[in-house]
Amino acid sequence: MKKFVALLISIVTVLTLAACGKKNNSEIDWTKTSLKSSYTIGAVEGAPTLSLVNVADGGFTYTDNDKNVTTDVTVAADATAVVANLINGTYDMAILPINNAAEIYDNSGKHEFRLATVNVFGVLYMIGKEDIDENMNNLKGEVVYCVGFGGTPGLVLKHLLEKNGISYEVGDNATDKNKVYIYPVAGGPEVIQGLNGGATKFAVLGEPAVTQVSGKTGASVVLDFKKEWQKFHGANSTFTQAGLVVNVNKVNKKYVEALVGHLKGNKAYLYANTDKIPAKLTSMGSTGPISKLTYNETILDRCSSDCKTATSMRANIEAFLAANNVELPGGSFYCL
């Protein structure tokens, strides 16, 4: 819990600092932004890094008037580090949760951090030691561990419980059989300990961590959050979880357009090169379990990696943000 609170405070601090010196600068012409010799994209380990695999390790070079522009992909320790490094200029771009992207856009005041694409389309699952028949009412009286409670996983879990008319509290002691108790945890190791030790029977986390934790606990997927989301928002609704945020004061538009064109091939690359994924992740700096998994079609299906422009997904993005009580950003937020 202490780690979670510290992480939440860090994110709030970063966003507050970004708001200092607020001014309206939404009419940035990033077609005139100078072209650098290299750009860096940051991402937290997990599905965000998988969405960049075909760019990593020299996978993408942009050429303009005989100038070669390289692209580096690097893994950050946690979501706070990704946000901080984007704001302080260490990263030129980053894969961020959509809700974080909207908050940074509004809080910066300069509106230079804009969404180019959506790359992760729902990787959240509930795993369990027993089945719930895809009915969240069967979680009443249970403790559910949640990785990323202060971010998208927690927002979506609470939203879906509310949509199902289920009361919840934050804590690890289930005293009311009519409530669900959500317990924030830092990551996979705590989930493994909780499931194996009997402290919980259920946990919310994202793929590919789902595969890694399931293999060490005997748990299985009992609820697909993407499907549960569609029950309340329509069968054609799209779960827009994370996307590419660009600092348009630092990155040239033509370069980003070329990069996005390349990223649209990432999904096909993943399925055609499952054996190369671990090495690609390692080249980004990944040292966690996801760089050691044996990837297959089932895992990739659950990772929901793709690349669609932000403008084409605007209606879905705004529905996702509104459902999670995040203030909708202005039109210039959608830069491609």
Q: At which residue positions do the language-model features occur?
A:
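Short, glycine-/small- and polar/acidic-enriched structural segments
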Residues: 25-183, 201, 207, 222
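C-terminal motif of bacterial Sec signal peptides marking the signal peptidase cleavage site
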Residues: 16-19
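Sec-exported extracytoplasmic/periplasmic mature domains
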Residues: 57, 87-88, 106-109, 131, ...
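Pocket-lining segment of extracytoplasmic ligand-binding domains
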Residues: 98-100, 179, 183-278
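Secondary-structure end/capping motifs
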Residues: 249-323
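Conserved C-terminal helix/tail region of periplasmic/extracytoplasmic solute-binding proteins
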Residues: 317-336
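Sec-dependent signal peptide recognition
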Residues: 2-10
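Bacterial signal peptide processing site
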Residues: 21-23
